[in-house]
């Protein structure tokens, strides 16, 4: 508990940084070309970074499961001149969740640690993030994830089947009206999933498709931003769609964007005016009383579809690590009764304004 309190205190200090201190972080700059494999690794000079992995898989009985694994890195700018190895120069957090459509249950867990001592780290030359017995690592063919949560375990492999999808303008993704409100951002859609999930001692072999996001920034959100709605969809025809909107304090759209990659590889970058999220149905959490628009109509460029959740209750309580509540859930996309694809919907800032 003392370690957790120290971590949350460090995050709080980071949130109180003024604009001048923000300039002490590395900044997102136009014209920078992402370099792989280097940019698969961590970028510790930036304030915030995450590796976000979600997917739909089926077990041996044909049941649908939703998987989510996210690792976060934060540079709080606290005690950076302190020579002690215990100084919290870099903080790491992780969330994992398992949604079971058959039982309607959601299991989730979280981790938090200061980087160091070989127990928590995010390597810079490749994707290799570790907190104790939770890890996400790059392999020769893709990625491997190992999670030993309190109620479930993941031993999953993710094979790359498509090229990296650079979001925004060649990997620079605007997140607000000011140019500096941006991130470096790429995705890897249509990852082929294999491996096992263990729940209550029962090990199940699973297979399916996943989506990986890697994003880093030092000034992600405008001060008037409340949160965001985001989707990442593996389309049934082999294409991929990412779309988001940043909401202001009144619920309006402060900024929006996305990318649609066709099955033939052509990419269309979506401008703010081409993306629209319209709530169709809301769900209220019985635990927190927070209300989320779990079913949505989405317009992304020239396509329009409805999102329906695998199940309504996919709220994640991460107040013990990253200090917030959010809805992160498996969804299907349909248009005219036809399934267009499967993916994940993220809804933040519905409990309180999101602070990164």
Residue ranges of each PLM-predicted region?
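Positively charged n-region of N-terminal signal peptides that target proteins for export
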Residues: 1-4
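Structured soluble/peripheral alpha/beta segments that form catalytic or ligand/cofactor-binding pockets
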Residues: 23-356
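Bacterial N-terminal signal peptides
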Residues: 6-18
